[in-house]
């Protein structure tokens, strides 16, 4: 930002003398012209002893405000500063002479202003351009450094562990494997807007570990503004380049699909996490089920919002339960502008779905920013595996952003929040089983690529407690059309079951091969 000299250069003489009077520096400034007076006063104000003395004499509210500025890196947007401290009254020479506001400041902002400890400028700070309140750099150098970062200062109280927990684990990754097999085995049609054909969407939804209710499926899933788990899954599949569209039909791309399927489960989950972090197609704010974002004259930055918020989540100790509302309140206290870095709350046209009035102004923070945080906690952060949540009266389907009390950061979430993949020594997967009734059972812990290959030559039957597929004539004909003979199917099943293929199943496949 600016030095004291740069800050004071454009001040009128009356304001410069008011600052000198407030700091008790009248005897050190004698120049008559504004430019010369600004140079003299800035030199006096920059004296380290004078700065330390001025800070020590500040009232507690002003010291707290100055510490907040230091903690923010020495600058914050003028709207954000005004919410904390109030506005500095402005007036010409006659008003200054009459009111003498430095003798009776009405708020902490005026105290710091007339002490020459802050300035105001239109500038670019941290990539954000706007009106900023700042501490001049030659003052900032002599102020105590912030003892904690914004994120570390959340200090959430502990909460008791809930009776029932929704464990996130690798559930979305398991459903991603289901998605890939579904696209491979079916003629999935997509319209120009990216929405799937209703019948395809319903068939895929049926196979998921957490299928959506029919009403939610018709209203949201697959749409560009759908705020449900299935919509996120489809968005991430597109972002990871798993398919292309040809003549309206989705066709799996072998290289990216195989690469993901053959990765270890922790790496698969991490790839989905990274795709969400970088996604501009998935705008979390516009996916909040109860909010409607309207108008084209404003734009939010979903990627920047995620990254700023995750800095705070990274300071939470994994495995410890906290109340959701305590986290929301802590973000409001310490970083309310996490998605509106300019601090302006009057330019985004957002309303609740059942109301016509727009939520303009900081007084609606809880209805917009708070709603976004609650959606992220119960939605993407949980679906992707970064948070476990309280399952009491709570589901994983389209309306699942309703009441929940507590959350905890998972071990893999802690690694991701630190910018690292999650390294874990997973136990060996349970074996795939083929039964005499031609059912094939694939445990959730099985390798994703093995399950994908099972799905290519079978018919899906169930996804819980294990994945269950059935060897059928229709499925074998589909596999044969893709170049997979019955002999290859038998060889594969023997390999993944350690040779335990029932004799009748083996004979049936051998007969088809001959």
Predicted feature descriptions by range:
Residues 9, 21-29, 92-93, 104-126, ...:
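A short, conserved structural fragment
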Residues 62-65, 72-97, 184-222, 318-366:
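Short acidic, hydrophobic short linear motifs in intrinsically disordered regions
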